[in-house]
Amino acid sequence: MAYPFQLGLQDATSPIMEELLHFHDHTLMIVFLISSLVLYIISSMLTTKLTHTSTMDAQEVETVWTILPAIILVLIALPSLRILYMMDETNNPSLTVKTMGHQWYWSYEYTDYEDLNFDSYMIPTQELKPGELRLLEVDNRVVLPMEMTIRMLISSEDVLHSWAVPSLGLKTDAIPGRLNQTTLMAMRPGLYYGQCSEICGSNHSFMPIVLEMVPLSYFETWSALMV
């Protein structure tokens, strides 16, 4: 959940998002150390007269500033590649949901059930109830079981869209004629909000996504009522 004037990322709900947060902190630490070193060198050069203005060759220094950046890039690339492969991994999903983007709403189909599908439209501001979020509430939430691997198949009926839920670390393009795949797993129950993250027309800002993660027993009851 995002908060007003929030400077950091949303709290992680999935293992992938937790890894992304760790990688974010790891990368920022490296950037902070490099920036501090560069600022220190610049300030030292500006405040002291002990500088070599006639140096023509310094093999040792050139070797250091060639090898050191290479090591830093490796330290950034290794955890990044690890997370990339984790995001592409699919291990026997317990449930598959097909998501279709439209101008300007989402439709969902639970492919493991014979007739469980619905459209999800944004609730207009004038119809919101007290406590509901403007531009983020929908008439039909996507109810999913927590602590289970869920596969999302994402495509579009018309133009480019993008299905994104920040707290789960998800952002997958919805492309007409192409079926993209992503997996998700929420570690705790709750409501998780997202939006279309690809400019898709005049009502692009009015395509919210709401995932309701619930215990398996509640999901089974809900799915039985929906079917």
UniProtKB/Swiss-Prot annotation:
EC number: 7.1.1.9
Entry keywords, A to Z: Copper, Electron transport, Magnesium, Membrane, Metal-binding, Mitochondrion, Mitochondrion inner membrane, Phosphoprotein, Respiratory chain, Translocase, Transmembrane, Transmembrane helix, Transport
Transmembrane segments: 15-45, 60-87
Residues that hold Mg(2+) according to the record: E198
Cofactor note text: Binds a dinuclear copper A center per subunit.
Mitochondrial matrix side: 46-59
Domain of life (superkingdom): Eukaryota
Binding positions for Cu cation A2 per the UniProt entry: C196, E198, C200, H204
Required cofactor(s): Cu cation
Subcellular location field: Mitochondrion inner membrane
A single GO BP: ATP synthesis coupled electron transport
Molecular-function GO term, any one: cytochrome-c oxidase activity
GO cellular component: mitochondrial inner membrane; respiratory chain complex IV
Record-listed Cu cation A1 binding positions: H161, C196, C200, M207
Function field: Component of the cytochrome c oxidase, the last enzyme in the mitochondrial electron transport chain which drives oxidative phosphorylation. The respiratory chain contains 3 multisubunit complexes succinate dehydrogenase (complex II, CII), ubiquinol-cytochrome c oxidoreductase (cytochrome b-c1 complex, complex III, CIII) and cytochrome c oxidase (complex IV, CIV), that cooperate to transfer electrons derived from NADH and succinate to molecular oxygen, creating an electrochemical gradient over the inner membrane that drives transmembrane transport and the ATP synthase.
Complex and partners: Component of the cytochrome c oxidase (complex IV, CIV), a multisubunit enzyme composed of 14 subunits. The complex is composed of a catalytic core of 3 subunits MT-CO1, MT-CO2 and MT-CO3, encoded in the mitochondrial DNA, and 11 supernumerary subunits COX4I, COX5A, COX5B, COX6A, COX6B, COX6C, COX7A, COX7B, COX7C, COX8 and NDUFA4, which are encoded in the nuclear genome.
Family membership: Belongs to the cytochrome c oxidase subunit 2 family.
Protein name: Cytochrome c oxidase subunit 2
Species annotation: Chrysocyon brachyurus (Maned wolf)
Organism ancestry: Eukaryota, Metazoa, Chordata, Craniata, Vertebrata
Gene that produces this protein: MT-CO2
